[in-house]
C-alpha cells in the first residue's frame, strides 16, 4: 500500500501581493456575493461553513492522489462516484507483484470487522498460501501471454491481491466525505490504512479545514 500526493488546484489570483492558497480560493469563491471578497482572512468563514453544513464551497478545489493497492481494494475505492479515476490497466500492461495480506479472524458479532488474534503458525500458513497461489497463477499468466492470449483475457487468472495503481481526483468536499466513511473502523483495514494516509496528506494541504473538522 502506498499513497502519494500528485496535484492540487493552483489559484492564479494574487491578493495583497500574495498568491491565493487553495483554502483561500475556497473562501474567495464563498464570498462571491460579498464586497469583501478579497479578505485574506478565512479561518472563521471556513469554520462557519463546516459547522452549518454549507458544503458547496468546498467543491471549488480539487486534489489528486496516486494510490497503490490491490485488485481487492480498488473496487471499494472506485465506488466513490463523486471522484474521477484513472486505473492501471492489465489490458495493456503486465502484472508483476502481489501484496501479502495479514491473516485476521472473522468477527462473528460484526461482519464488517476482523480480529488480529491468530497465532504465528496460522499467520505463517496464510502467508505461504498466498505466495503459493501467486507463484502458480503468475506462472500460468505468463504461459498464457507466451501462447499469445490477450492480456485482457490472461488477467482473469490473477488473484485479487495483485497490485494495481490508480489516480483519484476529487473536490475537497468529496475528500471530506470519503474520510468520514473510510477512516471509520467499519472499513476493511487495508482500505482504512489508505484513507488514513490520504487524510494525512489532505491535512498538510488544508490545515484550516482539517482543524475545523477536529482531525
Swiss-Prot record:
Recorded catalytic activity of this chain's protein: dUMP + (6R)-5,10-methylene-5,6,7,8-tetrahydrofolate + NADPH + H(+) = dTMP + (6S)-5,6,7,8-tetrahydrofolate + NADP(+)
Keywords: FAD, Flavoprotein, Methyltransferase, NADP, Nucleotide biosynthesis, Transferase
GO biological process: dTMP biosynthetic process; dTTP biosynthetic process; methylation
Domain of life (superkingdom): Bacteria
Enzyme class label: transferase
Cofactor(s) needed: FAD
Gene3D superfamilies: 1.20.5.3070, 3.30.1360.170
Binding residues annotated for dUMP, in chain numbering: 76-79, 87-91, 155, 182
Keyword NADP among UniProt keywords: yes
Cofactor binding, note field: Binds 4 FAD per tetramer. Each FAD binding site is formed by three monomers.
Binding sites annotated in the UniProt record for FAD: 56, 79-81, 87, 177
Pathway(s) served: Pyrimidine metabolism; dTTP biosynthesis
Enzyme Commission number: 2.1.1.148
PROSITE patterns, per the entry: THYX (PS51331)
InterPro entries: Thymidylate_synthase_ThyX (IPR003669), Thymidylate_synthase_ThyX_sf (IPR036098)
GO molecular function, one term: thymidylate synthase activity
Extent of motif ThyX motif: 79-89
Signal peptide (from-to): none
Active-site annotation: 182
Ranges for domain ThyX: 1-215
Role according to the record: Catalyzes the reductive methylation of 2'-deoxyuridine-5'-monophosphate (dUMP) to 2'-deoxythymidine-5'-monophosphate (dTMP) while utilizing 5,10-methylenetetrahydrofolate (mTHF) as the methyl donor, and NADPH and FADH(2) as the reductant.
NCBIfam families assigned to the protein according to its UniProt record, in alphabetical order: thyX
Family recorded in the similarity comment: Belongs to the thymidylate synthase ThyX family.
Quaternary structure note: Homotetramer.
HAMAP family xrefs: ThyX
Name used for this protein in its record: Flavin-dependent thymidylate synthase
Organism: Synechocystis sp. (strain ATCC 27184 / PCC 6803 / Kazusa)
Gene: thyX
